[in-house]
C-alpha cells in the first residue's frame, strides 16, 4: 500500500490543455473517487497515474517514488477497466493467473494467490469455467481477481460498472467497497455517476472542464458545495438555483418572497435549495406552481415553477402525494439549508 501525491498536474495535447494544475494528496489505504461529466478529464487523469498517458507538467508520486518516467509495469499498480478484457479461450483460473505467469512467479505461489482471490470474490466454483459461461457481474469479479492476485500498492478503477444493469451496479459497488476495506489497498475510482461516487468514496474529487472544483468527503460536498457546479452535480434530484438578493440576514426571491436566513451576504446572489430540504407549510415563502408529480414509491417529486417567475423547481417529499396541475403549494426551507453563491463566479459565498 502507498500514498499518492498529485502535484500541480497538467495535461495538454498540442496547444490544447485538458487538465489544469490538478493537485491532491491521497492517503495510504484511502478510497478516492474522481467524478464528473463526460469529457471532464477524469479518465485522462487516471491514465496519467497508471502511466498510460504522459504528464505534460507536474509530478505524480506513489509512496516515496516519483513515477512520471516509469512504465506502467514498474509502478506497482493494477487496473480494472470498463471492458473486462478476459481471454475467451482461457478458464477463470487461467485468466487470473496469466499476469503472474508472465512475471515468472512460481506455480505454487500462483495457485495460492488465485485461490485466495477466488475465495475473497466467491469465484471458487467458477475457476474452471470460460468467460462466456459467466454473468456480467461474475466476469467483472474475475477482472478484479486478476488485479488482486498481483498484490499491488494501488488499485485503479476506470468506470468498471458501466456495462452492468442498474441492479447489478448496486450489488457490485457494494462488493467493491467491501473488498477495498478488507484489503486496505489505496484506490482511485473513476465514474460519472454521482450516486456511485457518494456511496464508494472516502473522498471525492469533482472535475469540471479539467479543473478540480472540490476535493472532500461526500458529506462535505453535499453540505457545503464550493461552487454551483458541485451543488448541482452532487445530490439527486439536483439542487434548485434561484436568483435572489441578500440583505440583513435574509434573502429576497425574484417574486418578492422573503426567506429568513443568516450570514452577512449583501447584494445579488444565487440561492441554492435542495429539493429534500423544502417542507410543506401553508404560510411558507417558497410557493411553487405545480406542473406534474412523479410518484416514486418511497418519495414523490413535485415539478413546477416558482410562483410569479419562470424559474423551474423540484421538491422531494417523502411518501405519496398528489397535486393538481396548476395548483400552488407553499414550502419553507429547513434550518441551515440555504446555500448562497456568487452569480458571476459560481463560488460559494462565505457565511
Swiss-Prot record:
UniProt GO MF annotations: ABC-type glycerol-3-phosphate transporter activity; ATP binding; ATP hydrolysis activity
Keyword flag Iron: no
InterPro entries: AAA+_ATPase, ABC_transporter-like_ATP-bd, ABC_transporter-like_CS, ABC_transpr_MalK-like, ABC_transpr_MalK/UgpC-like, Mo/tungstate-bd_C_term_dom, NA-bd_OB-fold, OB_MalK-like
The entry's keywords: ATP-binding, Cell inner membrane, Cell membrane, Membrane, Nucleotide-binding, Sugar transport, Translocase, Transport
GO annotation, biological process: carbohydrate transport; glycerophosphodiester transmembrane transport
Residues engaged in binding ATP: 36-43
All residue ranges annotated as the ABC transporter domain in the record: 4-234
Reactions catalysed: sn-glycerol 3-phosphate(out) + ATP + H2O = sn-glycerol 3-phosphate(in) + ADP + phosphate + H(+)
Main subcellular location: membrane
Top EC class of this enzyme: translocase
Record localization: Cell inner membrane
Gene Ontology cellular component list: ATP-binding cassette (ABC) transporter complex, substrate-binding subunit-containing
Organism superkingdom: Bacteria
UniProt EC number: 7.6.2.10
Pfam families registered for this protein in UniProt: ABC_tran, OB_MalK
Membrane topology: Peripheral membrane protein
Matching PANTHER family: MALTODEXTRIN IMPORT ATP-BINDING PROTEIN MSMX, SN-GLYCEROL-3-PHOSPHATE IMPORT ATP-BINDING PROTEIN UGPC
General function of this protein: Part of the ABC transporter complex UgpBAEC involved in sn-glycerol-3-phosphate (G3P) import. Responsible for energy coupling to the transport system.
Subunit structure: The complex is composed of two ATP-binding proteins (UgpC), two transmembrane proteins (UgpA and UgpE) and a solute-binding protein (UgpB).
Family to which the UniProt record says this protein belongs: Belongs to the ABC transporter superfamily. sn-glycerol-3-phosphate importer (TC 3.A.1.1.3) family.
Protein name per Swiss-Prot or TrEMBL: sn-glycerol-3-phosphate import ATP-binding protein UgpC
Amino acid at each position: 500500500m502507498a500514498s499518492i501525491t498529485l502535484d500541480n498536474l497538467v495535461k495538454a495535447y498540442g496547444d490544447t490543455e485538458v487538465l489544469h494544475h490538478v493537485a491532491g494528496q491521497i492517503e495510504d489505504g484511502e478510497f478516492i473517487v474522481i467524478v464528473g461529466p463526460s469529457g471532464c478529464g477524469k479518465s485522462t487523469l487516471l491514465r496519467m497515474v497508471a502511466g498510460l498517458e504522459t504528464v505534460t507538467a507536474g509530478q505524480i508520486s506513489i509512496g516515496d517514488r516519483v513515477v512520471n518516467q516509469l512504465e506502467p509495469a514498474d509502478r506497482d499498480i493494477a487496473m480494472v477497466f470498463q471492458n473486462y478484457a478476459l481471454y475467451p479461450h482461457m478458464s477463470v483460473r487461467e485468466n487470473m493467473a496469466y499476469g503472474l505467469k508472465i512475471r515468472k512467479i512460481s506455480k505454487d505461489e500462483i495457485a495460492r494467490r488465485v485461490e485466495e482471490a477466488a475465495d475473497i470474490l466467491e469465484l471458487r466454483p467458477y475457476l474452471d469455467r470460460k468467460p462466456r459461461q459467466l454473468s456480467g457481474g461474475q466476469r467483472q469479479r474475475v477482472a478484479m481477481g486478476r488485479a488482486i492476485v498481483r498484490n499491488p500498492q494501488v488499485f485503479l478503477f476506470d468506470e468498471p460498472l458501466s456495462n452492468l444493469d442498474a441492479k447489478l451496479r448496486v450489488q457490485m459497488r457494494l462488493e467493491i467497497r467491501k473488498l477495498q476495506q478488507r484489503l486496505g489497498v489505496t484506490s482511485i475510482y473513476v465514474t460519472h455517476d454521482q450516486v456511485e461516487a457518494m456511496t464508494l468514496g472516502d473522498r471525492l474529487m469533482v472535475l469540471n472542464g479539467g479543473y478540480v472544483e472540490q476535493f472532500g468527503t461526500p458529506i462535505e460536498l453535499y453540505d457545503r458545495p464550493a461552487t454551483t457546479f458541485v451543488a448541482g452535480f452532487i445530490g439527486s434530484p439536483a439542487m434548485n438555483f434561484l436568483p435572489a438578493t441578500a440583505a440583513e440576514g435574509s434573502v429576497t426571491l425574484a417574486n418578492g418572497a422573503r426567506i429568513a436566513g443568516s450570514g452577512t451576504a449583501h447584494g445579488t446572489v444565487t440561492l441554492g435549495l435542495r429539493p429534500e430540504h423544502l417542507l410543506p407549510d401553508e404560510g411558507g415563502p417558497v410557493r411553487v406552481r405545480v406542473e406534474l408529480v412523479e410518484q416514486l414509491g418511497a418519495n414523490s417529486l413535485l415539478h413546477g415553477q416558482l410562483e410569479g417567475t419562470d424559474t423551474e423547481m423540484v421538491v422531494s417529499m417523502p411518501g405519496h402525494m398528489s397535486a393538481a396541475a396548476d395548483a400552488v403549494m407553499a414550502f419553507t426551507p429547513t434550518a441551515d439549508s440555504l446555500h448562497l453563491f456568487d452569480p458571476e463566479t459560481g463560488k460559494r459565498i462565505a457565511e
